Amino acid sequence: MSLLAGFRVVQMGHGLAAAVCGRLLADVGADVVCIDPDTATPLAAYLNDGKPVVSRDALATADLIICEGRPAELRAQQRDADALRALNDAAALVFISPFGQSGPKANDPASDLTLMYSSGIARLLTGQVDDLSEAPIRPVGEQSAFIGGLAAACAGMFAAQPHMSGAIVDVSIEEALATMAMGELTSAGQHGRSRSRKRLTDGNGATVCILPARDGYTAISPREDRQWASWLVAMGSPDWGNDPRFATKPDRVANWDALHTLMSAWSRPHDKQWIADTAQAARVPSFPLRELAEQLESPQLVHRGFWRAVGPDERTAKAPGPPFGLSVARQGGVAEQPRGPLPLSGVRVLDFSWVIAGPTTTRYLAAMGADVIKVEAPGRGDPGRDSGLHTVLGQGKRGIVLDLKQPAAVGLARSLAERCDVLVENFATGVMDRLGLGAAELQQRNPGLIYVSASGLGRTGPESHAVAYGTLLQCYAGFAGLNRHPDVPPRVGFAWLDPMCGLMLAFIVAAALWQRRRQGGVARVDFSMIEAMLWTLAEPLLETQRGAAPVPQGDRSDRHRLHGAFRCAGDDEWIALAVG
């Protein structure tokens, strides 16, 4: 049983973001058809694979209509809201454009490069730098289209809830990209300024860093004191481990450059995979920096059936499939007619998630009207409280402190789950089951509970028990290694994957609620963050299999006559230009 079985979608036009939106909807079972799709590039062909081409007659019966284009273009093509409403007055309409359908920039041209600069993402992507003459860069793989398409799919599913007839959504890709940097936006809003790109002090890598290896690099994150103690033992308890400069996390931040030099001297003689395996054995999050080609034969991804065959004979190439395991059962769900002013009015969410990805998901759900109850541990709480993140991600949520090591607290958690519609958790694999809060037990108690698990590599497969953070998975997937200038070593960079996964998970929850409300099916979701990262890297993965594996190239592009960033007056002022 598909999540969106019977949900009819019409995708209009050549835009890549619209194609991404349609791809995600199709991947969870929606009936997606196209009017005038683009198949001219391998990426466009992959995104539109399996979507029948139809005439405008299909608009009359659609539940959701997706259009990409600037307002003047849409009016000229009779694809604006007035024209579409004349054909279908009940469908949710989703418009995607670089800067939105209104405002002084609404009809301005844009490209992936210029959107990364105008949104502020380019200056954040690689983290702080030693030399401001190093230009900011865009990420690999047409990421503006993927973020814009994900935002459209998420907003579209909220707008298409059964009681939201005739809703209109206006997605600005620039705004969707800017929202990826919630912490930075919060800092700018509270203090009136953003962080400098210039690295002025130690400490930039004290929570996550890249170590040189004999055959490449390994990313590692011994950020907590207990992880640091385990990592010292894994390294053979070096004498410098007793240096008071490194005794606590604040000490390691203050003396990071000296510490990184010592760890690098230890790591250089070893293979990158051995370093990561040694760290993981000590329960310290770590992964080698991989090339994209290495992912194509990953035992973990093969085990989970992530790859799908694409091409005329379905054997031409491997392309990413949906980044989650999904089951939908009629084990007690009952079709319902929701009421209320917002898409998720009346929905209650039990939130066991923490840090960035899960709390981002539940923040979106709260904004759409859900009653979110956030569960935190006594004393420790969500690490997001240590930064400005909680100011944003904690909005609109209620909270409860439960010590889940105590049977009474577990009993209270079960009681809460019996009264909720959705549960979201991102603990390490096996934790919720050991607590007696696993999907099988809670869905037996509450047959209508939508249970969403998010983890680094998924809940099944040979690597399912690896401990992970989103920034490390950016390195493991091959993303971080490509996001740099050719002569610059790889950096971990900005936490890109976490907020992107939050957006995708919010979409999945909205789709699961549509299914339960309309057809009574109840979903169990097993979400893999690395699969989500690779899902957005479809273009470089396809290029790799054609013998044109991508290499770091900064802001350069082979598809444009002029494409790059140019320095202007000021310490760190740049302009991005893209000429076709």
Question: What do the predicted segments below correspond to?
Answer:
Residues 39, 379, 386-392, 406:
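Conserved core of the PLP fold type I
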